[in-house]
Amino acid sequence: MAKKRTAASPGTLVVLEHHSKVLADNPLGDPHVRRLAVWLPPQYDAGAGSRRGPRLPVLYDLVGFTGSGIAHTNWKPFGDNVPERAARLIHEKKMGPAIFVFPDCFTSLGGNQYVNSTAIGAYADYLTKEIIPFVDREFRTLASREHRGCFGKSSGGYGAIIHGMKYAKHWGAIADHSGDAYFEMVYGHDWPNTLNELTKYREPKRVAGAYDAPAEARARKGLAAGLDDGRVKRFLDALWSKEKLSNDEGHAIMNVCMAATYDPDPRAPLGFRLPYNMETGERIDARWRNWLKHDPVLLVGKYAAALKTLKAIYVDCGWRDQYHIHYGSRILSQRLAEHGIAHTYEEFDDNHSDVDYRMDVSLPILCRALKP
């Protein structure tokens, strides 16, 4: 797009403060009082001054890792933010009016996957047991799953497909843009880099010369069970004191966050275990199996009945995704087809970054499915 488009009526952005009981005393000590942005389309003001105006479908925007919902309402150069995009699509009559909700699910580990974890917090419960009822009380929504959907990209896309599986009683349609899938590839390729980053926080520090592998294994027995020997804690403490993270640090904290998401263990030093021995680099099969219990490509069969209740499932991914998610997306589509689950799957010539323009495809599909 060459310049900003302004023809559409902008609607109204409301920012509320929500006090969460679910997130109070969460394991990371993250705030339980959070801002919740809600965008109301121009049609919401029909019958202004009364509560007799139209009730509308609701779409929840689950942002990606390192993001927060309200960030999707920020001004963007050239492209649309999500409220602008929704306003334009409504103005162009490509979709009907809907309320958009932007939850804040950021954590000290950089984000989460919109699931419950004893190491991070109960973010699935936060969404389904607190935010949904709160929004339905405060706004004129069509307050049933048949008129409520969620969409997201990357971690948000993962959250959308997982909620369509495990929490389908709350959602009528979902859109998964480049969501994490096929963990063997999407996460496995990056863990060696994370181990190298964590090695910087090993004590004692590495020195050149002979390396006594048997002695190191005896001294660090916990590593074979995925336990921290102190380097992960030192890594996190160092990052939490920084204003800017390097690319390697950003990827490392992402993988640490995934470990806290997929393999929490209240008995472990940090409340979770790692899937690799940090000294030898060996994958720990018992720990990795816990990760695979959360892989969408392996969950379709288990949740096929729930997925079939959804009125729309949309999945897409760029075929140059730098995290190789397009392979997992293809497998996911294949598994959905094998179980007779209706869905739309598309690919496009792009990578993982700055692909919000794909919402021009997904949002109309969701709105058509959720309209009264």
How would you label these PLM feature ranges?
Residues 1-372:
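Non-catalytic cap/lid and distal C-terminal segments of serine-dependent acyl enzymes
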